[in-house]
Amino acid sequence: MNQTNFEWTPAFWQGWRESNNPYRRYKSNRDRQLVLELLDLHDGERVLEVGCGYGWISQALWDAAQINWFGVDQSAEMIRHLRQIPLRADAPASMADAIRLPFRDGTFDKVLCTGVLMHIAQSEAATLELVRVLRPGGRLVCSINNAMSPYALPVRVWNNRKRGFVQNFSFPRSFRKLLVGMGIKLGALRGDGIAATVPLNIGRFQFPPSSLFSSVQALDEWAANRWPCLAYEVWFSGIKIVRPCVS
């Protein structure tokens, strides 16, 4: 299979997030919905968004409450694009590696990392950093790509053509065990979707078909809420109850 170089750019993600494809739009809005439900934001809270990108999720956070938001991303281009959002030229966002966050222990009330851990080779080290900078009693919200998803294998095969692209799929039970071992008391799992949030477009072939969006979306949301362990992206939310032990 021929490989092509892949780069994370604001244009790529904005094109995906704000696509005319109804399934991509649904996925993007579903992510915002889950973030706000799980984070339960309140005025005055210090909130860290790891992997803030060009600001799609960030804008939903800013609108939800008067929070003290901080964002980090490994891409300077993403940060520049985020600061082009009206009234956000001075947004406290900076370049940082998720496995070496530039914050003291227990700095934040809430820590969010969605759509990121699956693209980090050292995802366990990054997860430990998320917990480290969260205060005891604070809330962590993060997500993984699900190895139990029906789409896990075809997506892996498709992404093999992208040189330099990292995408890990994890089992929810294993990741849950990891978080518990780091001192996170978890709530129920949530899922983005099973089929409606992973649209396939290869040439003229599209699945699921756009003409069936309304029916597919309604059925898929019901199924993902009932069986989140089959969702393509699984979301975890929990409270930090102890400081993790680092050997």
Where would I find each of the regions flagged by the language model?
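A conserved beta-strand element that flanks and buttresses the S-adenosyl-L-methionine
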Residues: L112
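A short glycine-rich, Lys/Arg-flanked "PGG" loop and its adjoining helix->strand segment in the class I
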Residues: E124-P136
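Short alpha-helix
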Residues: Q167-G183
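A C-terminal cap/extension of S-adenosyl-L-methionine-dependent methyltransferases
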Residues: V155, A188-S247
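Conserved class I S-adenosyl-L-methionine
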Residues: M1-D40, W56-A60, M78, V141-V166
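Class I SAM-dependent methyltransferase SAM/SAH-binding core
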Residues: Y54-R100
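Short catalytic micro-motifs in class I SAM-dependent methyltransferases
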Residues: G115-H119
